[in-house]
Swiss-Prot record:
Keyword DNA-binding assigned: no
Signal peptide stretch: 1-21
The protein's name: Lutropin subunit beta
GO cellular component: cytoplasm; extracellular space
Disulfide-linked positions: 56-104, 70-119, 73-157, 81-135, 85-137, 140-147
Stored CDD domains: GHB_like
Length: 166
């Protein structure tokens, strides 16, 4: 392996993979031609999203809605964002920290109001839920979303009466 090829290989190993758009072109001086990054590394970058994995999109979900002052949960069917987004896992530790990861989150949304059953007189039975109109892959907005690896799940009901009065 010549010096230029070793330098090219070291440069490629230290370069993070492209996660969107057209792969950059790399010129190999020993060949004198342009090669796509995927060709040099022997990867098919077009299929890294994984065939068979559903993309980020609005999906119908049933969630448990509850309020602290109301004794029961109510199952509500709404639209949320779900599916896969392309992520990167570094092969080396960077002093800059890990690369930002994207998750499937709301692009556009509207809000719907639901009234819970069995709430005591004088309490507010109204609950407002977001409804996904469109979704996108972006950094998880931790101020408004559950960005944990595995949350409680949409059907979790912590009310003492469980699901009642449907």
């Amino acid at each position: 392996m010549g010096g230029a090829q070793v330098l090219l290989l070291l440069t490629l190993l230290g370069t993070p993979l492209v996660t969107h758009g057209t792969p950059p072109l790399v010129v190999d001086p020993s060949i004198g031609s342009q090669l796509g990054l995927g060709s040099v590394l022997g990867l098919d970058l077009g299929s890294m999203g994984g065939s068979g994995r559903p993309p980020c999109r609005p999906i119908n979900v049933t969630v448990a809605v509850e309020k602290e002052e109301c004794p029961q949960c109510m199952a509500v069917t709404t639209t949320a964002c779900g599916g896969y987004c392309r992520t990167r896992e570094p092969v080396y530790r960077s002093p800059l920290g890990p690369p930002p990861q994207s998750s499937c989150t709301y692009g556009a949304l509207r809000y719907e109001r639901w009234d819970l059953w069995g709430c005591p007189i004088g309490s507010d039975p109204k609950v407002i839920l977001p409804v996904a109109l469109s979704c996108r892959c972006a950094r998880c907005p931790i101020a408004t979303s559950d960005c944990t690896v595995q949350g409680l799940g949409p059907a979790f009901c912590g009310a003492p009466g469980g699901f009642g009065g449907q």
